[in-house]
């Protein structure tokens, strides 16, 4: 069993939906038995959540006593209300889980939702879990990528964000040719795990991808050049020209239902909501 895959799951903020999601998800019969699952959190609090859900008549949940739990007895006065306590605990759960995964070959990490505001009010100044992961693993070149397999066709849908948890007004200043090239490298490498010579699309930043500088100049100033430079470095890769963001995900939406045979294998979104809105609607 030691060499079997290990999945480490954090409970996230205990006043949020994380514990409930875990108890429901791990009741599924579809999870392979050969996978070792370890929950990082507070066992007493997880049992309390289980009993509360059962009192509501919810039956399709797993008893925490049947789970392997890394029991961190971090003081949280009230797990029913979001507070600095729940924010601090969720941060420490993730820190501990990261160390477990770093020391465990053939392992993966699943994070439950946290409250970014409560992290900061508890003294942990990170804009999200991604940023803590990047720092903890000494990996500055990371990406937030969303992948899902269509239940209708088996086709895999991939979207990577060039920028993540920053105000939208800062996006044009955060983007540059080097950032776009590094994110294209990550996206292509990931998509290539599932398909040889994957097709990659890049969404424009401005409406209609700037309309040649009329609706914004970032595309003309550096985004088009970044795509051109990446193509030169990767001549065999299938990277499209810049696509208007309002139509960039249309073929993906059709492919999810099996109505399109030639969707992109990966899409690079230039900011958080540009990518997350279509991803959540489609999947």
Predicted regions located by residue number:
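Anion-binding alpha/beta catalytic cores of soluble intermediary-metabolism enzymes, centered on
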Residues: 1-283
């Amino acid at each position: 069993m030691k060499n079997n895959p290990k999945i480490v799951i954090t409970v996230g903020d205990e006043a949020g939906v994380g514990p409930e999601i875990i108890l429901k998800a791990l009741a599924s019969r579809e999870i392979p038995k050969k996978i070792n699952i370890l929950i990082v959190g507070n066992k007493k609090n997880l049992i309390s959540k289980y009993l509360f859900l059962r009192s509501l008549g919810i039956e399709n949940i797993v008893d925490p006593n049947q789970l392997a739990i890394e029991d961190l007895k971090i003081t949280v006065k009230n797990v029913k209300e979001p507070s600095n306590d729940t924010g601090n605990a969720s941060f420490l759960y993730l820190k501990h889980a990261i160390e477990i995964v770093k020391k465990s070959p053939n392992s993966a990490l699943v994070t439950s939702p946290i409250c970014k505001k409560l992290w900061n009010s508890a003294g942990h100044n990170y804009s999200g879990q991604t940023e803590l992961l990047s720092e903890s693993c000494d990996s500055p070149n990371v990406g937030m990528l969303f992948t899902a397999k269509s239940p209708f066709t088996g086709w895999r849908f991939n979207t990577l964000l060039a920028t993540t948890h920053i105000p939208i007004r800062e996006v044009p200043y955060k983007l540059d040719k080097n950032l776009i090239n590094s994110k294209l490298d990550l996206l292509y490498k990931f998509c290539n795990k599932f398909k040889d010579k994957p097709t990659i699309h890049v969404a424009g930043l401005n409406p209609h991808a700037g309309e040649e500088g009329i609706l914004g100049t970032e595309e003309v100033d550096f985004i088009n050049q970044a795509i051109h430079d990446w193509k030169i470095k990767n001549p065999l890769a299938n990277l499209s020209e810049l696509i208007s963001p309002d139509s960039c995900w249309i073929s993906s939406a059709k492919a999810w239902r099996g109505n399109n045979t030639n969707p992109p294998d990966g899409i690079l979104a230039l900011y958080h909501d540009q990518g997350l809105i279509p991803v959540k609607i489609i999947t």
